[in-house]
Structures are given as C-alpha cells and as structure tokens.
Amino acid sequence: MTEMTGSRLRGSLTALVTPFRDGAFDEAAFRKFVRWQIEQGSHGLVPTGTTGESPTLTHSEHDRVVEACIDEAGGRVPVVAGAGSNSTAEAVERAQHAERAGADAVLVVTPYYNKPTQAGLYAHFKAVNDAVGIPIIIYNIPPRSVIDMSVETMARLFELKNIAGVKDATAKIDRVSQQRQAMGDSFIQLSGEDATALGYNAHGGHGCISVVANVAPRLCADLQEATLAGDYAKALTLQDRLFPLQTGLFAEANPAPVKYALSRLGHMTDELRLPLVPVTEPTKRIVDDALRHAGLLVD
C-alpha cells in the first residue's frame, strides 16, 4: 500500500446502495447518486458491499456497478470496491476485476456461512493478497458472518504486502485500542457501525464506512472531520442530529430503510431484490421522523 492511498482512506466513506428499476440495475440513477455523494463531501465510496445488496447481484452486475462507480468518481475520491465471498476463488475473481477496473482498494468480508477457523481466515485473505496489487480492507462483521477474526490473526495478515486495515463491525469499541496497540497507527481502522463511529475515532479510529452517509453525506462528513480534528464538542452536536437516523435506518434489514429514505428524498426508487422487501408503515414513520430531525425532510 502506498502512503498516499492509505492517507486517503479516512473520514466518511459511503457504503453505497445499488438502485434498481423494474428489476434491473439503474445505472443512470447510480451515477447521479455518486456525483451527489462527492458534491456533498463524502471522503470515499464503497460500492457492492452489504448495503449495495451484493449477495443478490449477478457477477456481471457486480462488476458493472464497480466500473460505473470508478468511472463516475473519476479519481476525485477513493473507491473501495466490495469484493467479498465465502468462496475464496470468487473473492479473488472479484478483487482482480476491481483492480483492473481501477479501484483504489477492495473490501473483503470474512467468509460467511461456512465458518472457517482462524487458520482458514488467514489462508483466505492471503490468497486474495497474493492475487492483487492494491490495498485490502478486511471486513470483520460477526453479526452477519458468524465468525470473528481475532486480533492475532489480523496482526499476522497485516504483515502481508496488501493488507491495509479493517472495517470493524464487531460493535466492540475496545477492539480499536487492541488493534491499534497490536498493529500501530498505520493500520487503517474504519468503523462499520454508524452509531458508535464517534467513540470509535476517539479510541484511535480513522473513519467510518457509513450506511447513514447514503442519506446524509454532508452531515456524516462533517462529523468525521470534527472527530479527526479533535473537536468533540462539534462532533457531539452532529451526533445528536444524526442519531435518530443511525437507529431508524436499521429498524428493518439494511438497506430497506435506507432505500425508503432515499426515495423520500428523490434520489431513487425504494426497489429491493428478494428476499428483501420494502419497509412496513411503522418503519416509514420512524425514518420520516429521523429525516425531519436531521433537517433533511421538510413537509
């Protein structure tokens, strides 16, 4: 990893949704959304992750979403392409495609469902490391993958050339300090939990791969900039403004509430792919109230 690339993977990186229309990837809406994200101050973009409904994208759709994001971003902000799979061979293929397309880095989730041991996790990420020449961000998300990568395994992986950091969705705030003490400040630590992102940075984190930033990119960027500058009074004010979104957008399975919010703001339809379905009326009311609280929706 070059020092320049590492220094750019900071702040608010949006875990982008993938818009659909009539069952197909809506590339026009996606490109417009990418432009808006950059205009609103997002520090980076992360397509084809969990929020981007990657499990229900075909391989060709997955690749096209990554290509469109990189093309539209045009180097203005870094693009960290989701490239995870519980098949090591597929993770390698997606990571290699992302590198060919011009991604700045890839985000690789810990393999889900098949529950590898720590030795298996190491072998999986080493295989991806050996197959590409761009930075790799480990995505550690035990609530979805069932397994939890240990700090010791992560430290071993950091010795490899391309392992650059972690998206930490463990919800264990003490992990930030443990990982920082084990690997040093050059190991990029990005929160995967919007509601705890302020505290995450206080422990030495470098930013957040944010779901809420889909809806409130400027506010999320301002929050991250305040924490990284040590202005926690300003950060707390922004946190209070964002907090109802940080909870309301997870009232049902992500990204259903996010897509509803974006449909209310006029960015795209709320269309999802099965087995995800549109949110219920009670959740719509929760999201609407959160949008109003943040000053994003005026009736």
Curated annotation (Swiss-Prot):
GO biological process: diaminopimelate biosynthetic process; lysine biosynthetic process via diaminopimelate
Active-site residues, record numbering mapped to chain: Y139 (proton donor/acceptor), K167 (schiff-base intermediate with substrate)
InterPro entries assigned to the protein according to its UniProt record, in alphabetical order: Aldolase_TIM (IPR013785), DapA (IPR005263), DapA-like (IPR002220), Schiff_base-form_aldolases_AS (IPR020625), Schiff_base-form_aldolases_CS (IPR020624)
Subcellular location: Cytoplasm
GO cellular component, one term: cytosol
Pfam families according to UniProt: DHDPS
Catalytic activity: L-aspartate 4-semialdehyde + pyruvate = (2S,4S)-4-hydroxy-2,3,4,5-tetrahydrodipicolinate + H2O + H(+)
Binding site for pyruvate: T51, I209
Entry keyword Cytoplasm: yes
Entry GO MF terms: 4-hydroxy-tetrahydrodipicolinate synthase activity
Main location: cytoplasm
SUPFAM superfamilies to which the protein is assigned, alphabetical: Aldolase
Keywords: Amino-acid biosynthesis, Cytoplasm, Diaminopimelate biosynthesis, Lyase, Lysine biosynthesis, Schiff base
Site (Part of a proton relay during catalysis): T50, Y113
Pathway annotation from the record: Amino-acid biosynthesis; L-lysine biosynthesis via DAP pathway; (S)-tetrahydrodipicolinate from L-aspartate: step 3/4
Enzyme Commission no: 4.3.3.7
Disulfide bonds: none
Subunit text: Homotetramer; dimer of dimers.
Task of the protein: Catalyzes the condensation of (S)-aspartate-beta-semialdehyde [(S)-ASA] and pyruvate to 4-hydroxy-tetrahydrodipicolinate (HTPA).
Family, similarity comment: Belongs to the DapA family.
Protein name: 4-hydroxy-tetrahydrodipicolinate synthase
Source organism of the structure: Methylobacterium radiotolerans (strain ATCC 27329 / DSM 1819 / JCM 2831 / NBRC 15690 / NCIMB 10815 / 0-1)
